[in-house]
């Protein structure tokens, strides 16, 4: 275990199960802080999304509490302006999961370069996908052009590299803070109250997602359109 704090950048991966960056952070640090960057302008005309994010953060925070991990929400105009300040800080390592949208992939390159330049240890983990882009290739290194052999190889590749069940999120020794200016989930609210009706339809949480998936597999998949 390293003595400095492990920072986990929470993006859109509100899950405990197979959260590889969070697993890596807690396996290497006694103290871990999860942080979420709230870009208020992004949600100016997205009240439904704001509600979903707030409720997801509330549920995820409860899960993190079980592991003595504090969730800190930082309000920022842009990701870049936040990280430019973070580069100057010391005594931390940072972990995050890859997001596969082009803008995020490009931003990862910016982060990697600057963390290296500032001698900050970092770990970029696989996102919520089966295999990374470009991992599945033919013996000669070229991409598959027919689906069936591609899928057979993709399945075999995935099953062979499933992480050990022994590697999981470890409970930290104590809960600590890292950032000076933070907000709480109550400050992420909508001026309009029409979102209240959502609460009768959806419960944003990892556990609810598993429940709905199980229900679909047991009773819905047979009637699902081909």
Regions found by a protein language model. Give the residues of each.
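Trp/Phe/Arg-rich N-terminal binding region typifying the photolyase-homology
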Residues: 1-162
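Glycine/tryptophan-enriched, flexible segments
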Residues: 148-226
């Amino acid at each position: 275990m390293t003595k400095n704090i492990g920072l986990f950048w929470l993006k859109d991966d509100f899950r405990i199960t197979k959260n590889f960056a969070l697993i890596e952070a807690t396996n290497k640090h006694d103290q871990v802080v999860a942080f979420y960057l709230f870009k208020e302008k992004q949600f100016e005309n997205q009240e439904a999304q704001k509600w979903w994010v707030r409720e997801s953060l509330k549920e995820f925070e409860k899960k993190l509490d079980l592991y003595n991990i504090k969730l800190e929400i930082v309000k920022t105009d842009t990701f870049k302006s936040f990280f430019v300040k973070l580069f100057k800080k010391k005594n931390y390592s940072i972990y995050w999961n890859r997001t596969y949208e082009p803008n995020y992939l490009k931003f990862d390159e910016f982060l990697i370069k600057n963390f290296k330049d500032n001698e900050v240890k970092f770990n970029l983990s696989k996102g919520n996908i089966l295999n990374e882009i470009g991992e599945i290739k033919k013996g000669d290194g070229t991409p598959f052009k027919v689906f069936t052999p591609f899928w057979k190889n993709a399945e075999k590749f995935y099953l062979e590299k499933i992480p050990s069940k022994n590697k999981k999120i470890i409970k930290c020794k104590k809960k600590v803070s890292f950032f000076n200016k933070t907000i709480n989930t109550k400050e992420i609210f909508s001026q309009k109250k029409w979102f209240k009706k959502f609460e009768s339809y959806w419960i944003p949480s990892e556990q609810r997602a598993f429940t709905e998936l199980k229900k679909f597999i047991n009773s819905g998949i047979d009637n699902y359109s081909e």
